[in-house]
């Protein structure tokens, strides 16, 4: 099987010859691109443009890199997953609930951070947002103060919205090597070290502008999975569509875990 670099090199050459609009058929194994051709080889092939295939491969290359971030962890030591909710998006809501279940299935102990009472109506108010962040980080320090991080082989942070800022700040402050799942991160999240992180963003998220999040994620080399027309909860309002989005998201989460 060709490496990502070899496939990307092939695609760049083909784009020079044929242009980015040329339709190709990509072959996948477990959701990972392994090769491409110009004619369908079977009913399972997927028709996309060369440019789209290039972007897909670049995303997968980053994904493979961050997935290996904790490869040196002691496989025999206990594993811990910590959930950092949003202000209104609690740990019992779909993204955090099902990710926690998947982590538990993979042998992680689960701990959820509680922030206590935080300021309301923080959207668009930088002063209130800063106050909420400071209070939440202070509560996080208290909530996790008894944990001996050195006793765990693998640490997974699962976070949502403002929780993505809290989890990243906490990991940086304590110099922790973690894998991190960032659901609907804020722009402020990307001001922090994010090695070993993947992110999910909805293009209709009123809390974070898509172009900005894409640029910030690219700068930090964070694999960013976009969900079209989805809001800050990665939902569109259509029940069946939202169930499909949740399923697709959890499949990506499971591969990462």
Q: Model segments located where?
A:
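Acidic, low-complexity, intrinsically disordered interaction modules
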Residues: 17-49
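Conserved alpha/beta-hydrolase "acid-adjacent" motif
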Residues: 206-212
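Catalytic histidine-centered segment of alpha/beta-hydrolase-like enzymes
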Residues: 230-244
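Gly/Ala-rich beta-loop-alpha elbow adjacent to hydrolase catalytic centers
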Residues: 158-167
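Short beta-strand/loop motif that positions the catalytic acidic residue
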Residues: 199-201, 205
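A conserved short beta-strand
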Residues: 176-185
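Serine-hydrolase catalytic machinery in alpha/beta-hydrolase-like enzymes
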Residues: 59-151
């Amino acid at each position: 099987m060709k490496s990502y670099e070899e496939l990307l090199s092939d695609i760049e050459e083909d784009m020079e010859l044929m242009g980015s609009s040329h339709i190709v058929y990509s072959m996948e194994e477990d959701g990972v691109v392994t090769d491409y051709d110009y004619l369908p080889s079977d009913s399972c092939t997927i028709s996309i443009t060369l440019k789209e295939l290039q972007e897909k491969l670049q995303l997968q290359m980053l994904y493979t890199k961050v997935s290996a971030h904790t490869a040196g962890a002691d496989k025999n030591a206990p594993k811990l997953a910590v959930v950092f909710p949003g202000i209104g998006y609690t740990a019992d809501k779909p993204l955090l609930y099902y990710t926690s279940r998947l982590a538990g299935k993979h042998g992680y102990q689960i701990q959820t951070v509680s922030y206590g009472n935080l300021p309301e109506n923080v959207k668009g108010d930088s002063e209130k947002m800063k106050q909420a962040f400071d209070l939440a980080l202070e509560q996080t320090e208290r909530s996790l103060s008894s944990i001996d991080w050195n006793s765990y082989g693998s640490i997974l942070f699962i976070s949502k919205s403002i929780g993505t800022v809290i989890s990243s700040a906490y990991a940086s402050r304590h110099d922790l090597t973690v894998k991190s799942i960032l659901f609907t991160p804020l722009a402020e999240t990307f001001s922090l070290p994010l090695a070993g992180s993947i992110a999910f963003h909805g293009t209709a998220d009123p809390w974070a502008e898509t172009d900005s999040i894409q640029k910030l994620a690219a700068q930090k080399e964070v694999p960013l999975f976009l969900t079209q027309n989805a809001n800050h909860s990665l939902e569109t309002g259509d029940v069946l569509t939202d169930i499909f989005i949740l399923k697709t998201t959890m499949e990506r989460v499971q591969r990462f875990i």
